[in-house]
Regions:
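Active-site flanking loop/helix segments enriched in acidic
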Residues: 71-75
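Elongated alpha-helical scaffolds
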Residues: 79-97
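Core of compact, soluble alpha-helical bundle domains
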Residues: 1-70, 102-150
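General helical structural elements
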Residues: 78, 96-97, 139, 150
Length: 150
């Protein structure tokens, strides 16, 4: 099991450029998005964070800061948070495809897939949660201003 994790991390590190290139071909990026370059940087950063998580160098709480950063960027860009979810799932699919190339045994595969799911579920949950907290603040501020001037 540890060997599968090690090989997966090694493959992702050595093939990072190819991985990101494949991912970029499938993600949603709006032309008007002021953070469109950040999307790729965030993806690269998350790939690195994922490999650190698999190697148990970081825990899930440590990705919450990047979740907040991404939520703020999506809010500022005025794009639907669903695009982030879609792009994240495309990255997850790319990692799963890489795992299957390693041909792990059933039990090894199950354990690694559980870790992959946990990482991405945590990332998506905290990003969407942060996004909606920001939206709630924005809407509250809007109505407060509206009351003030009406």
């Amino acid at each position: 099991m540890e060997a599968t994790k090690r090989y997966l991390c090694l493959y992702l590190k050595e093939s990072q450029e190819k991985f990101i290139s494949n991912w970029k071909k499938r993600i949603l990026v709006h032309e008007h998005d002021p953070y469109k370059d950040e999307i790729i940087k965030n993806g690269t950063h998350l790939l690195h964070a994922f490999t650190m998580y698999i190697r148990e160098e970081i825990n899930l709480q440590e990705i919450e800061n990047i979740s907040k950063k991404i939520a703020q960027e999506r809010m500022d860009a005025k794009v639907n948070i669903a695009d982030f979810i879609y792009n994240t799932n495309e990255g997850k699919k790319e990692i799963l495809n890489t795992l299957f190339l390693l041909n792990p045994t059933g039990q090894e595969c199950k354990v690694v897939i559980e870790q992959i799911n946990l990482f991405f579920d945590h990332l998506i949950y905290h990003t969407v949660y942060s996004y909606y907290e920001l939206r709630k603040e924005y809407i509250h501020s809007y109505y407060e201003l509206k009351k003030k001037y009406n």
